[in-house]
């Protein structure tokens, strides 16, 4: 960092499998928390002035409906805890070293580049739309829904799905805001609308026929529902989404998986 005169950092590195985090806390502590601490230590006595950090809406814990940035953190799972602790490390380091931070609390990131040229290769983190896209290429697709006894309308988890291309744009705008305004911020990154797992699967079933839906027990660490209050987000960054369409998100993910296969 010092050798290359780095002035701004976008910190995305972390493990992100909610279930795995519960089973292997040491792995997640070392990579997510200690990794962040090591990065901050490397920033000491450097030219770094700004850092954008990818956090998670999971730090809010069990909420009902829309959640704003003012809500007190209440992480329920270990993955969420690692994000919360990383946020705290960044805030503390900022006070001690006079640099600005932008904390972006991601809601559920999904989809791929509309062009079909860029997407996610990792298949093991258990994200719903990624799994649906993978299954779309199979002759006999099977979808697992983890939990149908949550306190939601149809019993399945509700999430706010945000297109990855929109999220990438947020990082650029967030970094520009730090440079132009010299003010730190914490913002939700979502569209402000939630879809249940069942709703997403039902949309997918209209795209792919013959889907075998299997209901399983809840996954440890999952919360019932959460979606973003985006008022502060849009006000500060003057941001407007380009891909706020759940069908577009699903189709872009499927398009990417087809490219990987070919």
Language-model segments: residues:
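NAD(P)H-binding glycine-rich loop region in Rossmannoid oxidoreductase-like domains
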Residues: 1-31
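Short-chain dehydrogenase/reductase
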Residues: 27-29, 76-84, 118-130, 160-161, ...
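Hydrophobic positions on the long internal alpha-helix
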Residues: 35-43, 90, 170, 174
């Amino acid at each position: 960092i010092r050798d290359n005169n780095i002035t701004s950092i976008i910190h995305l590195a972390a493990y992100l499998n909610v279930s795995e985090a519960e089973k292997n806390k040491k792995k997640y502590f070392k990579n997510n928390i200690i990794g962040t601490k090591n990065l901050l230590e490397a920033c000491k006595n450097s030219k770094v002035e700004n850092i954008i950090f990818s956090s998670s809406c999971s730090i809010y814990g069990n909420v009902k409906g829309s959640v704003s940035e003012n809500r007190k953190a209440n992480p329920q799972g270990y993955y969420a805890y690692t994000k919360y602790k990383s946020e705290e490390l960044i805030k503390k380091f900022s006070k001690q070293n006079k640099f600005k931070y932008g904390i972006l609390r991601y809601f559920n990131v999904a989809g791929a580049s509309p062009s079909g040229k860029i997407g996610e290769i990792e298949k093991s983190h258990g994200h719903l739309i990624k799994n649906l896209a993978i299954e779309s290429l199979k002759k006999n697709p099977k979808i697992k829904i983890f939990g149908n006894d949550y306190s939601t309308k149809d019993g399945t988890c509700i999430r706010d799905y945000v297109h990855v291309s929109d999220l990438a744009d947020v990082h650029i705008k967030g970094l520009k805001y730090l440079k132009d305004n010299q003010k730190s911020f914490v913002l939700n990154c979502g569209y402000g609308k939630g879809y249940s797992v069942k709703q997403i699967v039902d949309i997918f079933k209209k795209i792919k026929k013959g889907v075998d839906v299997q209901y399983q027990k809840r996954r440890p660490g999952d919360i019932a529902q959460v979606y973003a209050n985006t008022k502060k987000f849009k006000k500060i960054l003057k941001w407007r989404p380009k891909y706020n369409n759940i069908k577009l998100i699903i189709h872009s993910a499927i398009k990417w998986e087809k490219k990987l296969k070919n």
